[in-house]
Amino acid sequence: MILMAKAALRTKLDNYGPQHRNMPVGVARGICPGRVVWVRDPKAAQWSGNLNSTVDHWWMDRNTDQARVDAMMSATLQKLTGARTDEEAWKRIFTYYNQLARGMKARGYHDDEVVAVEINLNNSAAAGIGNYVNESPQVTLAMVRQLVLHAHVPASKVVVYDARRIIYPALLTKIWGEFKDVRFVQNQESQTVQPVHPGYGNYHGLEPADWVEGVTYSANNYNEAKLIPRQIKAATYLVNLALLKAHSYPYSSEEGGDEGQTAISMTGKNHFGSIKGTPELHAAINTDNDGTPHAYSPIVDLAASPNQGAKTILYMLDALYCGRRHQSYPLHFPNPPLNNRVEPYANTDWPSSLLASYDGVSLDSVGIDVLYSQSQNNFDKNQHPRILIRENADDYLQEEATPDNAPSGTKYMENGKPTPSLGVFEHWDSDATRQYSRNKDPKHGQGIELIYIAM
């Protein structure tokens, strides 16, 4: 009875709905400002959905097609940048970032610079991950291939990490099998159940986070939340490779664990995997605590930090398999343009998508619209919605878009100066047409442009 009452109370609060459609706020970023590219190949993700199998998992190559994922990644990068080749796409990515963030004209990548790839391994374990949603080995490898083979970053200068979790075996072997010098950073020393490096016969390239002070906050007194890995502080660039995933769901007996603390886990919250003291920030994002409507969000400070989010050259959402909660099995998305079957669960229809942008605010804005659209008219046999979006879901995006005039009234500061707009926030016109202001008016639109590519 207590659990039912708690779920009922939580559901009353899960009343999020997009407001003020096609009314962008903030300043769009990117070569093509505010552009978000969404690429889908339904044949890339083909897992059977057999949750009870111990030998058939979504992350296996027989279920997730590496060649198709690579093609999706290439199409995403080229459409995002307007380039005709992957090499040209990366040249434009680095040149744009170095001009915008470092004031360097016509400056591309130099081979002494480290590129960190920030991933979401919230459900990772040293011995394996079962079928909980984590960053996929296939998308991670596709990104590493792009960096090494097309951006010409030496493998030894690529650092893949989630400093709050341990790296699961399939991810290590997938990357090291092709790029032996790629480094990984995790939350602890290597564990004996983790695979040794096939090229070195030991744990070469698997490092624990070396915590150093690197982040400041515009409100509240935090201690360990100021600490980030030395390895990431030393990096020149960051790729924010997050998941398209909600964070809270009250009807979760099947999956176990608590209901969650906030609405979504995309590129904004992905930075929680970079700081030691994430528990210190939980109250600020928990809508049952300090995360009230239009409250201060530490996500803004993490996104603006010169040692963290301000290093970002590319934002991407792995949406091959999406989740409804921080601890979640893959979820079918039944509504357009995905049109997955939801019953029986054991079927091969999945979101099977990648989304990317130069503008993290724009990307998460699109992500929220996608998640919300999939929550509509989507009920299980108990008449529970299969996915819910918790209240205040887009508040942090409004704060990021206008930190100099934030709805919370917070004075966001970095290095003693007001934090400028971190991107543009907007909701699409409707779930049916999915049009943003730059789609409707390419010449005068000031918000997001969404490009959908079906492969």
Predicted regions and their residues:
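N-terminal export leaders
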Residues: 1-3
